[in-house]
Structures are given as structure tokens and as C-alpha cells.
């Protein structure tokens, strides 16, 4: 049995590292791997999904290298780049007479104007100018004018697969759509017991063509989603005579009966009949009818099957048209009809051609949810489609200008208006459903976001319409889309994640690799298969036992055949074998150890919650990993990796310089305390020293949530499974005070606050220290410009940037005019519109950026200055925060106990976390218990004595390990239960010769409060615990007075608006039930929308008087106004029958408010827009 000793991690320079098989040096690490299966293939580049697609669109150097490699027998790569395809497609643009034409060729990019970091700092888009050679040909004179034309700035992808748009990182998600092609379906008829059979020809763009055989056995056709008509009418219109149809379809009753009901005679009659159905109300002429049909299906400008559509049509119908034929042919339509009637008649095959040889094509209905019929539109194609719409809008402009401009004066530059192209690209990146704000909580979140597959978006499904079938796991997802990782909620099953080994072929279908079996020997040769190719083969699992010659060890092998059915077959019938055990799951799921012991629902939560883990102050790689941690962290791009071999010559906190073996030197930047998209700290830390040797792929600096180049999302904590005084009831968690004191679970969060000074109608706003009516101590931390100093500690309400806005001038009195004349402008009225720290936020100012128009910074129109302040705060773990393991075991901290009260082991070590054992059995995520035990074994080290039975699969190299060893237990191929049981009895004892945890994984624990032992032994071990981004500080909220809604005058809702708590219908019933009338009256009036009353109450409280009577709530006045607007004359009567005048007594309100110096109406607006 070959078993790799060490699985994926640290660089090859790590001590004692050993190479295995054909793995490259960078996947070898200090992890002791319990994997038994030899993997012939490394996990491919995890970002290739994004980068390869974008390279194809641009046609850049990397793409050209791949094309060259493919001509030498590598992976098939499309030979024209995406932009080239579009410019070829649109060229030439001709005027209406065809005498002038404009064509495009040879696009090229200039270097970007700003660097990536500049773009992020200045809110710009990281893009490169695109130039195209445009040629104008005057057909009358034969004159050719050629020019290089600027086609706008084209956003560029960063090395990490993201785009920087207006200073923020965004990701374009790949879209899963139904592939163009022909689909045959069988639909049960609701009214009768007969089925209807349909065929749809779906193009990449253009009109659909649908055929159906109904319960009366007549064959109908729908052209462009309009009314149904006889299929024979369409055939006649395409030039078939009645006798030809009879001859071709003589054996099919359905066609003959359809033909007999069809009363059109000849081509003209049929064309006019179709025209009447498609364009009712327009006078039918033969010319118009022929044009209509030609434009619908035979005009390449209007109809496009795309290469993938032609490929699918050829495959389905058994034809061999060239892939460049992107329109339908009459033959395609006739063969489709033939296939449909054969399907209806119950025939199984029809004659076709493959590789020039006649073959029998299977006649069967299609499964729409099969991955052979769903393809991926990745970044390149999505942007290409967008550029195509922009160019076709531009085409219209060019045509118009050709006719209106003087022919002599025309140059390509005067014809072309690039605005529509630029606008459509901008629109896609800014507003498309598929261009998303990058999830940057931690590196895994970013990596998963880039590998996401979405069935939503333009041209895809919508949440409301998608049924159960589309969302369900399908056998063809195996190795292509992860069956585990998908959101909970309305998007379940519509958004997935690409499996670890999946890759995209040139047609957009997902392929997955298999080991080829040659003459009964499982070779290391790997073939990639698409979902419909795979259906033809018999495939064994990765864990099928092999003998020393790489043949199957057992006579019958468990395999899956077509349709995902599993069965045992003789070993000589197997065609392929899985490449790896983790082949079917995504990266995040492959990072859950003992996944094979977890229920799928909980594994789903575990995979999703790893993406919400906040980067901690000190990252720590898991004791129990799966061997995927290194590749995930490096491919996510958040660690700094050496690109050339050499020696580190200069190492500082934010820069590393290496002198390379080839005589060059490379400088690597290290990011310090930047703010991520989600407010977590993005901080990289150098891990090498000056003079260290580095190889290609050596990790030079760790990023957020990485440790030694491995993904490190949480901390290894000592956990005991036991109830404790009911404080861990229902998933609540008890923590030790040690985790607070030692900052074990502390994280740093950075908020960005921004204020701009604009020109207003009354004059410019000003950023200044000179603010009216503000005490000097409030301004203590502001510098002379009025901007807070770096290092200042701030809390809610503190000033960050002083700013004043001119107020509206009133008519001046003579005295004021005199003052104005003497003292100049100084006496002008200004309002304080300073930037203050929002409610509930505290921290330290760590950065200030000032952009000024006068110093040449590009700012939006009307803005003179822009100031950004970065406030960081360290959040220690506290009760109310949410923690989780990797197995979907989540909970909220209910109590933090002093260390001395925590249960402790026999040697006095207190545990860190107490979890409730009842959280395990009903949820069936037993993986957490195995992780706990193996974590204990790893922390203590082990030594296997003798040759016990349970250890026969454990390789010689990992028979012993020191304390604190990191372990890899790959998914579906990890440590077995008997191995864990055995190792528990083989851990290295303490100095006293004791093993604190017995062979059953349980320890004798003592109560920290009394020192008495607990009556039963308790399971204790190390578990990897994550702190999730659901922090109580972001959720807790309280309000006294604050903003009110304009119309109802009730407090706004929600923390963001500094709103109040809603006292709803049911709460009112509760108070009514108790008869608490006064409390209720107070809640509904003076605490809410009795405008006058609430001011008077404030006044009474301030002056220490009795609370006055409540008045009439504003919402009652609104109700009356609404009834009056419905022409109902409503009056309010007092108890003695007199009409009460419902007018607003504003004077009282303002008098009281002015006396008290309060503004109860709304918050002070902080920017001009709010004023």
C-alpha cells in the first residue's frame, strides 16, 4: 500500500521534508498524513477558472503561450481571442447602399495609467487603454483610410482574479446556463393520459424554434415563441414539396396525418401562411415573408448557435457540419423533425455520421439538469457579450454618420463614437448581478467567491421560478460542482462551487480528470472527461484497493455506471478510476477533516462558516488539517510567494528584496494593516530572515488567516464535552477568561470614514479647526487643518474632521451690516457639518488620507477636498460573539468563566472551552468528536510500539511523532476510527508517566470551583475553533432620542439609522391583556409620534416637573388625511360633541425646543446631500 507521508504544505526548504511520487516540492510539508491513496495529479491552479478565461478575452502573452502548447498536443484552446472574435464579427460595417465600409483589426493594449495600489487609494478603475486599427474603404473611389482608434479604457484583471472598479475589489462570478443546442423532452399531458413530445432548438442568440407532437398525434411548430402551426407548412416554406415529405416520412403516421390536415399548396402559400401568424395585421407579401424567415434562422447577424451550439447539434443529430456554421440549415430542421417523430414512434436509433463513418445515433429524451447540457459562461465570455452589445450600438451610429457626413471628409475617427462601448463595459462591472463586491473576510472567502458558479443573473434562472429539480444534486455534478457547498436559504442549489479538480473546456463545459485503465492496470495517465462523455464509461472510486502492480485487488469493484447508479462489476470491465478521493468536493469542503463522518447538512454549514471566520491577531494553523490548507492559501494570493529562486538580501516589515540566481533582483511589497472589503484587517507578516535561501514558491510573508503559508482560520483550543450548570444549554458555549486575557481570539477591525468639502449654492464648504459653538477640549485631538491626529483614541460622537457649511443668509440689520463692513466676511453664518464617529464605534486612528483638488488629485465634480480617516479597533472575544467548528457546530458564547473556575485535568491544566455533548448525536456531525481525539493525539505526540493490527496501514515514517505535530487527514481518505483508538493508547506520557486521556478518549476532570472530580470521565481534546464575523459589538444598539420618519413622525428602524425598537401589534396585545393602559398610552404617544408631547416630556424631565398629558399621535392625523384624500369627510369630536381642529401647534414645539437647546426633529445632517 503506498501512502504519502506528508501532505500539502510548507516549502521544500523545510527540514526533514521528503518527496513523494511526482508531487512538486511546494506541496510537501511538516504534516503527518494519514492518507492511504496515491494521487497521480496535483490540484490544478485554483484561480485558472478566472485567469484563463480573461487571458483568452484579451489574447495576451499567457494565452498565446497556451495556444502554442495546445498545438503541440496539450489542452484544446480556442485559437482566436475573445476581442478578436468580436471585431471580426462586426467587420465590416457597411452603409445602407454598401458603397462604404469600416472594419476593425489588430487590437492592442497600452500599459495601465495607474498602478493597482494607486487605483485602490484614489478610487479609480484599474484599466488599460484599448486601441484598434480601423480601416475605412470608399467603394466608389477605392480609397482606403486607416487609423488607430482609442476604444476606451478596458478594466484589467489582477493576478488574483479580481477587478478594481472605482477603488474597490470586485469579482465576476461564472454563470451556469443552459447550453445552446437541441433538446427533446417528454411532457405528460395533464388533461389526458397521453404524453406530448417536444423538441427545442435553442441558439446562443436569436429566435427559438420549437416542435411538438400533441396528444392528437399531430406535429406542430412554434416559430419565435408565437402561435403553433403545422410543421408541414414550415417544411413547404423551406422548399420541400408534398411528395418529398410523403416519401421521407412514409412510415410515420403522425407526419402523414399532419400533412393531410395542412391545406397550403406550394412554397409561396406556406410562406404567406407563416407570415400571417407571425405578423398579424400586416399585409403579407412573398418577399417580406421570405425575408422574415431568413432573418429569423439563416442570417448570421441575427442568429448565432455559437461553436458550442453547433457542436451540440452535430452530436445530437449525428451530423458533421463545421463548427463555424453558426446558423441553422434546412437539413438541421428536417433531421430534428425526423428525430422527434422517431422518438414519438418509440425507435431507439437513427443513422448518422461520426468521423466520416456511418454510425447509429441514440434517440432519447434529454435531461436539462445534466451537466452535459449546462455550460459555464466565465468572465471572458460575459465581458465579451457586453462588448458585443456596445459595439452593435456603435454600429448604428456609424451607419447613420456614413450617410450624413461628407464622403471626402470621412475618417474612421469621425465615424466612431466609443461612448456606447465604454458605457456597456462600465454598466456590466458596476451593475450586473454577476459582478459582485468581493468577499474578503478571509482568504478562503475570496478564493471561494472566485470559484463560484451561479445559475442566476441575466439569461439565467430567477429564484422565484427555479424549481426543485434544478436545485437538486445531479449525478453529473460529480467532480464538477460540489454537492456540499451551496448557500442555505432561497439560493440553495442555484449557487455552487467548482470542485477541486474541475476545469473548463473551450466549449464551456466542466471537465473532471480520471485515471485511465489500460489492460487492467490503473495507469498514472489522466484524461479529462465532460459529463456526457463520462456517461459512456464505467468508473471506479479512488479508494478501490490496488495491488503492487496497480491492478484492482478484488475480483469485483464498486463502480458507477450511466445515470449515477452504483453497482459491483468484474474488474476487467472498469474503464477509468477517480484521480483523488476529494475529487467531488470544493476547496472549502475539502478543508473539513473527517468530512466522511459528518451529515451533509452540517458539512454544508461547516463549509459556509469557514468563509465567515475573522482573521485573528495571531493566526495558528490547525493541528488537524486535510492537506488542502497550503494550496488554498497560496492560490488565494494573500501570501507573498517567491517568483524566482535566490537569496533574501533585504527584509523589512513592508518590503522584501531577493537577489536571484539569474543575476536580477526582485522586490516584493508586504501589505500592512489595510482595510478589507468587510472591515477586517488585511495584514501580511514576513516569515523569512535576511540571508535565507528561497526557491520558486517559497512563502516569504503570511497574509491574514495564514500561518507558514497554510490557511489558518481559527485557533486550536482545548475542549471538554460536558454540561456545565446549564450555561451551555442549546449550543451555548462557555469560554475561559484566558482566551480574553491572552488575546487568543482577538481580531482587529478597521473602519473607513470619509468626508468631502463641496461647492454649495451659498459658497464652498471648508475643512477647518474653527467650528462654531464647540469647546476647545473637543478639538484637542484635531491638528491645525481640522483633521484628527494619527494615534488618537476616539469613541462615538468624537470629531474626526471639522467642517463648516455656509448657512442661508437672512436680511441683515444695519448694525450687522456695519459689523460686516468692519470685520469683513468673518461674521458669515456657518453650520457645523463635521465628520463624527458613528454610534457604537470606538478605536484608534491609524491613518488619514487627504485629497485636494488644488494639489492635482482627481476628484468628482463639485468636490474640492476629500478626507479619509481609518479607525482600527481590537475586539476581544466577549459573550454574545458567535464561534463555530469546521463541522457545522456553531454556537454563541453565553459565559466567560475565570480560569480558576474552569474544569481542569489531573495535571492542573484548565480547559479552554466547554461544549454541550447533546449538540452531537441529533446533528450527526461525529467528525468533530474524531477531530477532538486526533487533536489530543497530535498535541501530545505518539509512538507506536510493536506491530499492532490497527497500525498495519500506517506507513513506517509516521510511527512516531513529537508533541505539537500537525496532522493531515484528507477527506474520504483520512485516519480510521481504529487508528485513532489505537493512537490514544500510544500517546507520549507526561513526565510522571501518566496518560491524562485514556484509550476511550476521556479524561478525569476536576471542578475548578470545588476541586472535586466530576463523577464521570469527560471527552477532552483539541478542536479547531473559528470566530465568525457575527460580532455582538456590531449588533448591540440603544437609542434615547434620534431621527424620526418624515411622514409618520415615528422613530426610524434599525441600527444603521440609529432607530428605535418596534413595539408591534402583538406587543400591544400583551400590554392590553395585562390592562397596562398607561404604559401602553405612553408607548404609543409621547415615546413615539406625539410630536408636541415628546418635546414637553423632555422639557419636564429636564426641569424636574411632572410628565404632562399625552396629545394626539401624528399617525392619527395621517390616517385622517388619508381618509379625506378618499373623499370621506372625517371629523374628530370631543367628548361634548364639539369638532376638534386638527392643526399642528408648531409654535409651542419650537419654543420649548429652543429653550432647551435641543433638536428633536432629526439628526444634524453630515453632508450637503442630506440638507
From Swiss-Prot:
What residue range is the signal peptide?
Answer: none
Q: What is its EC number?
A: 2.7.7.6
Q: Which residue windows are transmembrane per the record?
A: none
**What keywords would UniProt list here?**
DNA-directed RNA polymerase, Nucleotidyltransferase, Transcription, Transferase
Q: Which reaction does it catalyse?
A: RNA(n) + a ribonucleoside 5'-triphosphate = RNA(n+1) + diphosphate
Q: Which GO terms describe its cellular component?
A: DNA-directed RNA polymerase complex
Gene Ontology BP annotations: DNA-templated transcription
Q: Which HAMAP family does this chain map to?
A: RNApol_bact_RpoB (MF_01321)
Member of which family?
Belongs to the RNA polymerase beta chain family.
Q: Tell me how this protein assembles.
A: The RNAP catalytic core consists of 2 alpha, 1 beta, 1 beta' and 1 omega subunit. When a sigma factor is associated with the core the holoenzyme is formed, which can initiate transcription.
User: What protein name does the entry list?
Assistant: DNA-directed RNA polymerase subunit beta
The scientific name of the source species is Kineococcus radiotolerans (strain ATCC BAA-149 / DSM 14245 / SRS30216)
Q: Which gene encodes it?
A: rpoB
